[in-house]
Curated annotation (Swiss-Prot):
GO terms for cellular component: 6-phosphofructokinase complex; cytoplasm; mitochondrial outer membrane; mitochondrion. The keyword Transit peptide does not apply. One of its GO terms (molecular function) is fructose-6-phosphate binding. Its EC number is 2.7.1.11. This is ATP-dependent 6-phosphofructokinase subunit alpha. The lineage of its organism: Eukaryota, Fungi, Dikarya, Ascomycota, Saccharomycotina. It comes from Saccharomyces cerevisiae (strain ATCC 204508 / S288c). The active site is at 356 (proton acceptor). Beta-D-fructose 6-phosphate 2 binds at residues 391, 482. It is a peripheral membrane protein. Residues 1-580 are annotated as: N-terminal catalytic PFK domain 1.
């Protein structure tokens, strides 16, 4: 190195370039050295911003200010103590560096750039600098390291705090304090190391790789986050495979060991942050052998793959070939037998990431409901303009071999017709049926027509049915028709609540499956049935999935649709009954036609109108008469208003929030006699109640009133509809998904605000009454640090633990983005610790090191437009309830009058209803979702055995697992383990 004059302890310097690439490279260089960005000014973006432009040069296009902060005494949380309060007054020298990008560099030609002074900075860890720059760094002595930055500036790093010092200075000279806080802080840090040593000493760490492959889908990031953090929690090393199978082939930097903080904020990101790519090389054995070598070199013998059927098939093939691939690697001399001995078997676990929802054996795949939500949102927008011009719109959606998106979108958007691959339309005849359906709906008063076409739609001769083919048919009808191809907008955006929840739970279960894996275990695929996470053999699921395409190619369309799950088939039949077959083809005999009442009870909830619409359309297509009881039971008592609903009344209700027929919290017991009178007057044969706990209570009151009021001897059922999800006996209520989506958007926004201001915490209050479901679910899918629910009372110990967890998070904070923190509190979690009081306690304990704010979304949680999932579920439940009423009436007809155990009622010759039995428990029921089952549960049994009447909820806390998983992923359990390790060490 040339001998240069040295400028020691420079507090401020400015360097200039007119090369943008060099500008960025220099910033990265100083970031690597530990400098932090404190200002990033862009003349074109921030020129009018007086705060950002303050202190910048007039000729700067961009300026980035980097600071190396002084070392000084820190408190228990690792935050700097103000100098006037510190017991140790020593401080190291800080430095501010201004890097400027200008139009043209102002360098005098006579200036000799070889006479540059060397700038010297103080560092307590010279070896680390050499490690970071092994080729550039030159160690001149034990206390001096020389470097050149990308602009050619000479820099030395000295271990001497001052030029006059004779011995190196350690960081303890600045950080060391005599306070108890500092001792605790260091002990906490040591506890982390102790915990890692303890976990590592018992057995060799399991190393797991996680990758995303094939087409991206919303929710993949949530799955990766769950795998990474769950793996770390269970003492594993977790690696992310970047760029899918291509990353497996390349190895090296594409296999990155992940830390806890690496996946912070990933829940709210769309796509996949670790990338995805299709690899032709991996399809060859040579490519798979190369991938095996890369995994073994990192010690990895478990792989979690999130992708479609092709990706999962490749993964399972990789597993079966693994032993022979390892033998080939040994034969090639890349590894010895001893080196590969621990890696004789490869564990594979599959997660289905696909917006098509085309995997057999699972109800939904990661990303499917997010894509459906995008479709419904777009079609809702299209409907608005279509009605204005009285147009027809043909909308093409994805689904090459699976019509799930098209079917669900058809139900959720009130489409007139759908085309799906599983049910091919008759060649040359489908045009006539399409035109007949659209013309019939127009004649009933509809102003627009919506047709949903899956991209893989075809006729029974395997000819493609395109959006333009459909358009041509509608033009023949004389309709002004437009085509909209949604394309990749369906993949875009962040994941909805359902997909975040699904990906998180499946990611956690994937790690558990890896740890439980044996060489004899078939590769598992993590799926879901109704509300329950399940495992199923990967090979069989993929085989069934591919057999659908085979059946279609063989023109066996009955087999193709039979291979879909029962829910798919049920919903397809429901769509036909409510839309296509409203031509009188399904009318029942006059003697079997019923009068069915529909009433909304309780607070407004999304999808009340969607359920009423589906029930009405199904009734009309079968000849029943649907009657809307206006304004709840109080409206019936006060005015007796009951309206017979027509097709045009409900045609546009599929995407309307609130209640079009009115709702309130009045219950049936306010005047059972008057209610019985109007039931008798309208000759009701059945009743559907939509509502929450008030609806649940009303159903019980009507059932109990059968002794005094024989008219109540009719089949009655409740469709749970409440954002609180507090109806006993069921795990799902209409409106919950809409509520959770609203909360996801709300919390994403406030977390962004918290991240922008860096050290900021929000305490968010959510609804739910005495049920902690919404709070627990929201905490899980938003990455909340803590969740306060009524089921687990808040106490000072739990608050203290949360404060410690927050301090630990912020102690390691380096000013990165995505570091806003969220705490979720149920509105009834405590009568003492209110949302504001919690915020005040945490704020006081933070001693100004981070800010705390409250956020209360209130009735925003009820949502506006119902979510696509709520719309589809509403339709499914409504049709099931009509069938329930039909079946009970059939049962009555088939029963002899002498059998008093079965509900019976008939009209006499004067048209009066004659009850023949006091009550029948099973005929008054609640439609319930429990795990993987949908069933009708008698209200009498639910009220007696499963209802906490005082707290207005069920006894079962079916969401308890969400809190446990939330504690794992937030780091709470990790912190507890560290504290326990520290306590054990102190003993």
């Amino acid at each position: 190195m040339q001998s240069q004059d040295s400028c020691y302890g420079v507090a401020f310097r400015s360097i200039i370039t007119n090369d943008e690439a060099l500008f960025k490279k220099t910033i990265h260089f100083y970031h690597t050295l530990g400098f932090a960005t404190v200002k990033d000014f862009n003349k074109f973006k921030h020129g009018e911003n007086s705060l950002l432009s303050s202190g910048t040069s007039q000729d700067s296009l961009r300026e980035v200010w980097l600071e190396s902060f002084k070392l000084s005494e820190v408190d228990a949380s690792g935050f700097r103590i103000p100098q006037q309060e510190a017991t140790n007054k020593a401080q190291s020298q800080g430095a501010l560096l201004k890097i400027r990008l200008v139009m043209s560099a102002p360098i005098d030609e006579t200036f000799d750039t070889n006479e540059t002074a060397t700038i010297t900075y103080f560092s307590t860890d010279l070896n680390k600098i050499v490690e970071k720059f092994p080729k550039q760094a030159e160690k001149l002595s034990d206390t001096l390291v020389f470097l050149k930055d990308p602009m050619g500036n000479n820099i030395t790093f000295s271990g001497l705090a001052n030029a006059t010092d004779s011995a190196p200075t350690s960081k303890d000279a600045f950080l060391e304090a005599t306070s108890e806080d500092e001792i605790i802080s260091r002990a906490s840090s040591d506890a982390s190391d102790l915990l890692r040593q303890t976990l590592g000493s018992s057995q060799k760490k399991k190393k797991i790789a996680v990758m995303t492959s094939g087409g991206d889908s919303p929710g993949m990031n949530a799955a990766v986050r769950a795998v990474v953090r769950t793996g770390i929690h269970f003492g594993c090393d977790v690696f992310a495979v970047y760029e899918g199978y291509e990353g497996l082939l390349r190895g090296g930097k594409y296999l990155k060991k992940m830390a806890w903080e690496d996946v912070r904020g990933w829940l709210s990101e769309g796509g996949t942050l670790i990338g995805t790519a299709r690899s032709m090389e991996f399809r060859k054995r040579e490519g798979r052998r190369q991938a095996a070598g890369n995994l073994i070199s990192q010690g990895i013998d478990a792989l979690v793959v999130c992708g479609g059927d092709g990706s999962l098939t490749g993964a399972d093939l990789f597993r079966h070939e693994w032993p022979s691939l390892v033998d080939e690697l040994v034969a090639e001399g890349r590894f010895t037998k001893e080196e590969v001995a621990p890696y004789k078997n490869l564990s594979i676990v599959g997660l289905v990431g696909s917006i098509d929802n085309d995997m057999s054996g699972t109800d939904s795949t990661i990303g499917a409901y997010s894509a459906l939500e995008r479709i419904c949102e777009m079609v809702d927008y299209i409907d608005a303009t279509a009605k204005s011009h009285s147009r027809a719109f043909v909308v093409e959606v994805m689904g090459r071999h699976c019509g799930w998106l098209a079917l669900m979108a058809g139900i959720a958007t009130g489409a007139d017709y759908i085309f799906i691959p599983e049910r091919a339309v008759p060649h040359g005849k489908w045009q006539d049926e399409l035109k007949e359906v659209c013309q019939r709906h127009r004649s009933k008063g509809r102003r627009n027509n919506t047709i949903i076409v899956a991209e893989g739609a075809l006729d029974d001769q395997l000819n493609p049915v395109t959006a333009n083919d459909v358009k041509d048919a509608l033009i023949e009808l004389g309709l002004d028709t437009k085509v909209t191809i949604l394309g990749h907008v369906q993949r875009g955006g962040t994941a909805v609540a359902h997909d975040r929840w699904l990906a998180t739970l499946q990611g956690v279960d994937a790690v558990k499956a890896v740890l439980e894996f044996t060489p004899e275990t078939p590769s598992p695929l993590i799926g879901i049935l109704e509300n329950k996470i399940i495992r199923m053999p990967l090979v069989e699921s993929v085989k069934l999935t591919k057999s659908v395409a085979t059946a279609i190619e063989n023109k066996d369309f009955d087999k193709a649709i039979s291979l879909r799950d029962t829910e798919f088939i049920e919903l397809y039949e429901n769509f036909l009954s409510t839309t296509v077959k409203d031509d009188g083809s399904e009318l029942l005999p006059v003697s079997d036609r019923l009068n069915i009442g529909i009433v909304h009870v309780g607070a407004p909830s999304a999808a009340l109108n969607a359920a009423t619409r589906a029930a009405t359309l199904y009734c009309l297509s079968h000849g029943h008469k649907p009657y809307a009881i206006m304004n709840g039971f109080s409206g019936l008592i006060q005015t007796g208003e009951v309206k017979e609903l027509s097709w045009i009344d409900v045609e546009n209700w599929h995407n309307l929030g609130g209640s079009e027929i009115g709702t309130n919290r009045s219950v049936a017991s306010e005047d059972l006699g008057t209610i019985a009178y109007y039931f008798q007057k309208n000759k009701l044969d059945g009743l559907i109640i939509l509502g929450g706990f008030e609806g649940f209570r009303s159903l019980k009151q009507l059932r109990d009133g059968r002794t005094q009021h024989p008219i109540f001897n009719i089949p009655m059922c409740l469709i749970p509809a409440t954002v609180s999800n507090n109806v006993p006996g069921t795990e799902y209520s209409l409106g919950v998904d809409t509520c959770l989506n609203a909360l996801v958007n709300y919390t994403d926004d406030i977390k962004q605000s918290a991240s922008a201001t860096r050290r900021r915490v929000f305490v968010c209050e959510v609804q739910g009454g005495h049920s902690g479901y919404i709070a627990s679910f929201t905490g899980l899918i938003t990455g909340a640090v803590s969740v306060y629910t009524p089921e687990k009372k808040i106490d000072l110990a739990s608050i203290r633990e949360d404060i410690t967890l927050l301090k630990e998070n912020f102690r390691h904070d380096k000013g990165e983005n995505r570091n806003g923190k969220l705490l979720v509190r149920n509105e009834q979690a405590s009568s003492v610790y209110s949302t504001q009081l919690l915020a005040d306690i945490i704020s006081e304990a933070s001693k100004g090191k981070f800010g705390v704010r409250t956020a209360i979304p209130g009735h925003v949680q009820q949502g506006g437009v119902p979510s696509s999932k709520d719309r589809v579920t509403a339709s499914r439940f409504a049709v099931k309830c009509i069938k329930f009423i039909e079946q009970w009436n059939k049962k009555n007809e088939a029963s002899p009058n002498t059998d008093a155990k079965v509900l019976r009622f008939k009209f006499d010759t004067h048209g009066e209803k004659v009850p023949t039995v006091e009550h029948e428990d099973d005929s008054a029921a609640v439609i319930c979702v429990n795990g993987s089952h949908v069933s009708f549960k008698p209200i009498a049994n639910l009220w007696e055995n499963e209802t906490n009447v005082e707290l207005r909820k069920g006894f079962e806390v079916h969401w308890a697992e969400y809190n446990k998983i939330g504690d794992i992923l937030s780091g709470r359990l990790k912190l507890r383990a560290e504290v326990a390790a520290l306590a054990a060490e102190n003993k």
